[in-house]
Amino acid sequence: MLTPTRVNKIIDIVAKDYPQIKNKPIKVTIQKGKEAWTCATSNSDYELLISKVYDLEIGNNSRFAEMFLPYMDDTFKLDLTWFLADFQSALDAVVLIHELGHVIQTSEINFKKGNNWMNYARKMNAAYEDYREECFENNYNYLERAIAYRQIPYEYESDRIASEMFNKYAVRLISIISGKTQKELKTIREEKMYELQEA
């Protein structure tokens, strides 16, 4: 379960590889019953809007997870074995770091220089508009739309960062979110992997 304190611990871990994530303060807001997790930015700070858990019972979240995890495995070799230790906490970690990936991508833009920010915003808006046009013109179903969305450069880069950080720090991330010890999680993972091999 995510709390502002736990999120800030995860930000500290990510900052070891991406120190620019600390360029501006990140305000963490825990929202209730929301499907979308977002990261908004201003001249002075970021606001991360997340939920206590990435709730698979809300909206399209369950369908999204069914697409997202195989996609992340195929595209970035996300280590899915850690999902055996604690599925919910592992999913929360990956989706959270995806949002932090958006912070990392914008962290070095000088917002006080309008041209820098406007150029970035124009490119980003054009990429999302291309995605919407592609979906409309091809009459994509949910799965096709979801896959196309992941190919938007800003989403793709955040997915890459999420996979990289999760694969490197999985047991620590899951431990922070779940409250279980790293030893417990490693044991659960090993037992589940053994069960799968024996099945």
Describe the function of each predicted region:
Residues 21, 26-44:
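Amphipathic, interaction-prone secondary-structure segments
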Residues 4-22:
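Zn2+-dependent metallopeptidase catalytic core
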Residues 104-117, 164-176:
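Substrate-binding/catalytic groove segments of enzymes
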Residues 38-90, 100-107:
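Active-site scaffold of zinc-dependent metalloenzymes
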Residues 9-13, 99, 123, 127, ...:
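Charge-rich, solvent-exposed alpha-helical interaction surfaces
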Residues 5, 129-199:
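Long, well-structured alpha-helical subdomains associated
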Residues 90-91, 106-146:
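Post-HEXXH active-site segment of zinc metalloproteases
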